[in-house]
Structures are given as C-alpha cells and as structure tokens.
Amino acid sequence: MTRLRFLISRAMRQEAPVAALSVSRLKLLADLNERNVALVGNARSLSEKALGTEIDAADIIVRINRAPMPSAVSHGTRTDWLALATSLSDDDLERIKPHRILWMSHKRKRLSWNIANSEGFYLHPLEDYERLKQQLGSPPTTGAMMIDLLSQSGLGRLTLYGFDFFASLSLTGSRTADQVPHDFSAEKRFVEDLMARDQRISLT
C-alpha cells in the first residue's frame, strides 16, 4: 500500500485496507508462546519501587503509550512492544525504540503512516475494543486492552507492573480519575477476576 492510499483509507474510515497492514492476531499471539511477559503501566507508584532489573529480565517487555521511564532502577530500560492509543512524536519513538508497535485505539485517524508501515505492526480489531467496552461499561484503557489481549495467548507468565488503577495517577499527566473517560473500579475488578481464573497472571 502507498502512503497516499493509506491516508485516503484512513480518512474515509475504510477499515480493511488499513487492517491489511497488520500482522494477524494469530501471528502476534504465537510470538508470546511460553514467554515471560512484563506489561508496564504508567502509574506514578512504580517510580517508588526498584523493579527495573526484574522488568528487564522478562522475555518480552510491553509498555504503554508514552512509556515513561524516569529511572532504570524503577522501570528498566528495554521496550519490545509498544501499545499505543495516542500519537507519538518521532523523538518519543526514538527514545522508546520499540521492536513492534500495536495500535490499540479505535480512533484510526490518529494512526500515522510511519507506524502503520513499521515492521511487525498490529492493529487491534474494533470488535475487540467494543467487546471490552461493553464488559467494563466504559471505554477501556490501553492497559486493560493489553491485559485482555495478552491473556488470550499461550504465554508462560504475565506480570503487571505500574498498575494501581489510577490510585497514584499517571506519570504522563496530571488528570484525576474524574477527568478521564475510564472506570478504574471496573478495570480493577476485571483484572482481579482474570487473575483468579488464570494463575499465569500476577500484579506486582
């Protein structure tokens, strides 16, 4: 696909041509088989811990949106997958250096050609977003979508870091829970229920 064709498809909300740039869900999840995965959220509370070495020891490290890493001691340094629901500058992408980008947002208009054309690119299906939105009763966070997606793979272990469901706010902004369109209580229940059913998943 050419850049022009991509821009036209995106502007006209033609899902199929844009989705054709994505690796399949089957291929994406197969890459997780038997792997130890670290999903790093953006809670401020993570910066008070010394988990960076543990995070960097994972087979695959997934970070979210702007992927703040204020200290290697607390956050580690590596990013294998970057789950995005917002646009990022070239400087941010150069700082994060992800090996693969997953576009999780249902808003395709924010998806850039450079990201869509990147190696290993994955486009999260709209029906998956809508299913989780219905389950939670509100738009899901990028973190919740990633937990849902990763749990459906054959990974060996999934450890969640930097997830306190907005109790300490986010490292990437100053908004409170009342100022964002997510239901963090519902997401907390969702994760707790998932961990109770799936012993591979833990919250640190």
Q: What is each of the regions a protein language model found here?
A:
Residues 1-204:
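Metal-ion/cofactor- or nucleotide/acyl-coenzyme-handling active-site neighborhoods
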